[in-house]
């Protein structure tokens, strides 16, 4: 069985096929943001397997700033098929991956085992892996609509603000391991995606904030130490969820 590359002109038409949650959430979400123009600077390629009735999908997000992302999802429970899918799809963009210093794969552990096997088989230069187990959470449309109707209250003396590229430096100061290229990455995300902050009115300082990662997931939440235990983090996260859903 062969893999195939989705032509860019077909990205819009393939979206309904990918709207299977949570199985294809990362692939669908990334492509949807790209099609709508609500994503940081990048190029995206999408692959499927097999050609007849595809059940295995990969989105390769080549970021202008920062490492590329490989997002993998499947609607099949047949783990015996995973290896065939990986070994059919990855050669279609393996040369691009080889040219990168690093890349991030988002997928199930059962699939990642075959990704690791492929990379070893194809002799990737200086290849090593670092697994970071995560749990993914999402809300269905009914719960999103409910959230839109939920009032979000801040303590006295605080107010919501929208963040943009001009706030990148403040956000970067909370990232102790940031590299020199991360500033451009953060600015690109703030320019294209919703981002929320809470400001302390008296001092004008940003007290808490959250913005989206390169795939549109909310994952960068921070409250400055002097403003913690006031409920600002929960308020920021709810407001960002509202903004993401509206956009």
Regions from the PLM with identified roles:
Residues 1-29, 142-182:
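Short amphipathic alpha-helix that is part of the acyltransferase structural core
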Residues 35-64, 73-74, 191-208:
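Conserved beta-hairpin
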Residues 43, 54-156:
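Acyl-donor-binding surface of acyltransferase catalytic domains
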Residues 73-78, 174-175, 221, 227:
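Secondary-structure transition/turn motif
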Residues 81-95, 229-246:
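Conserved acetyl-CoA-binding loop-helix of GNAT-fold acetyltransferases
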Residues 178-226:
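A conserved beta-strand-loop-helix scaffold within acyl/acetyltransferase catalytic domains
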Residues 224, 246-247:
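Ligand-binding loop in jelly-roll beta-barrel domains
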